[in-house]
Amino acid sequence: MILNYLMKLFVSIFTLKKIPTLSWSSFNTLNLKPKSITLLYLIFGLILCGLGETILIAASAGVSPWTVLAQGLSVKTGYSIGLTTFIVSICVLCLWIPLKQKPGIGTILNTIIVPVVIDVSLPFLPTPELIVFQILQVIIGVVILGLGIGFYLIANLGPGPRDGLMTG
């Protein structure tokens, strides 16, 4: 009973009905000439997304579903995880066509920046052997990924390839 109450309280506190907009948010997802500050926040957010995913990969304790797909393809093909993430993103963008989804600048940059950050940063991150440190690394990765997603969504310059597929 108490647990049920606490869960409802938690959900009510952390539930957003729409993505917030800030002074630097784009007025339109298909804006082809966003403010420089909006573009900077978008790029910063996408770098954080890539870094968060990389930290999760390096922890070897579990990753997001799309990254599992990229990892599996990486193992089977011998390509890097970043390259397979890029290939998956392009394939997912092709699935937007029947949905009549339109990519924004954020969509294109997401397709490019996240895989590049994964490939550039992965060689520098440790893979902890102790489960305690793996869990700590996962927590850090999830927090960084969440912050990155927040920045890129608030920039409002188009969804990432996977987001657009799921919301289209």
Where is each model-derived feature located?
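Core subunits and conserved enzymes of cellular information-processing
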Residues: I2-G168
